[in-house]
Amino acid sequence: MPQTPIFPSMLGSTCSGQVQPEMGEHCGDPVYQDGSLVSGSLEVLIERLVPTLDYYPDKTYIFTFLLSARIFIHPYEILAKVGQMCIKQKQQLESGSEADKAKLKSFAAKIIQLLREWTETFPFDFQDERARKEMKEIAQRITQCDEENGTIKKSISQMTQNVLVVLSTRGQFQEVREKIRQPVSDKGTILKTKPQSAQKDILSVCSDPLILAQQLTTIELERLGNIFPEDLMQIISHMDSLDNHKCRSDVTKTYNLEAYDNWFNCLSMLVATEICKVVKKKQRTRVMEFFIDVARECFNIGNFNSMMAIISGMNLSPVARLKKTWSKVKTAKFDVLEHHMDPSSNFCNYRTALQGATQRSQSANSSREKIVIPVFNLFIKDIFFLHKIHSNRLPNGHINFKKFWEISRQIHDFLTWKQVECPYEKDKKIQTYLLTTPIYTEEALFLASFENEGPDNHMEKDSWKTLRSTLLNRA
């Protein structure tokens, strides 16, 4: 029977998520379509995960199954079933001929390889003590196959140590993230008077659009590095009801996704703050044109997320209403950027640009050309859409593996992008400003905007009066 394909594009426009089986419709046998695995019972899919003397699962199958199976069963339960199957095979070899016994070491090496791939790709499955216990039990059985020189025991020890290091690193990141997260909600500055022109601003920290775009890219890549496949599958977990979701304790663990989403929002608000807090129109115009140039450099780099955040910030109402300032801005470059991010036809222009950046990355010789940072919000929506329109199970009870091939393909692309080594050195001064400088609340932005360019209609005048009254009474 054929092996699983390398992430085929399997969900065409005519696909409804319902598989027309070629075989195994009324049993647990896996179903293939055009040589590709499209469905099967959970038990059969787990069996395909377990190596034998003559078989080792394709890497893409391992990734897709371990990624998607958590929708139906806890990772530690999969480990338990894998362990049972391994022990059964081991016992069969031990009770066989001398030739079979000689193959024990080879069999054990394959099991270790599977565990290594699992721990490297989904290390946070092993945050669960039950998963660590199951892995330990498998390891104890397998080490018996090579007691003479202890090679397998050493491999297991190193693998376990690597997992603990990764878990520890993530724990440290979480502690740091929690410490800097709280002040973010306090960054809104309530304005009682006009901001002072001597106030520190972005141009006094960095006046080169390319350098700022590069520093934004280092921040993006650092945050992408803390997002893992398990985090992305939480999107589906949140959509499934608690009654149907097998990993209930994991449903709310989306810290890394929240942190990345918060970064996008903070960058948008920072852009708006930097523009609205400038008193002089000429300087405000310069700041606007600077951010347009930064967004363009982000586009050239392949950093679409920062580019979108900057454009979003400049399109916020407090900035968009500054008509006198915009009249002085050279908007040709901004119009081009907005064209790339035009939401019509499901962001067709952006997707074309993303595809171009992906192709450039695949043939790149330098890390600078490999950078692809998608608009994260749109990436999440794509996964949401795939999950929403295709069922998890088919009428015969099979898992709809065809659906999970496509989801895993998109997540695999994301993992490839996030693993790119950042080619830019951190500038501590610039990054400190980007990450810690106070940003205005929406109310404060509107008030600053009105003070820079007064209300030009009755609705704006009423809003201005209400804002001033609210903010001053709050002080």
Curated annotation (Swiss-Prot):
Domain Ras-GEF: 208-455
Record InterPro entries: Ras-like_GEF, Ras-like_Gua-exchang_fac_N, Ras_GEF_dom_sf, RASGEF_cat_dom, RASGEF_cat_dom_sf
Pfam family, any one: RasGEF
GO biological process, one term: small GTPase-mediated signal transduction
Listed GO MF terms: guanyl-nucleotide exchange factor activity
Start and end residues of each N-terminal Ras-GEF domain: 33-164
Keyword terms, alphabetized: Guanine-nucleotide releasing factor
Domain of life of the source: Eukaryota
Disulphide bond pairs: none
SMART domains named in the record: RasGEF, RasGEFN
Function of the molecule: Guanine nucleotide exchange factor (GEF) with specificity for rap2a and other Ras family proteins (in vitro). Plays a role in cell migration.
Designated name of the protein: Ras-GEF domain-containing family member 1A
Source organism of this protein record: Xenopus tropicalis
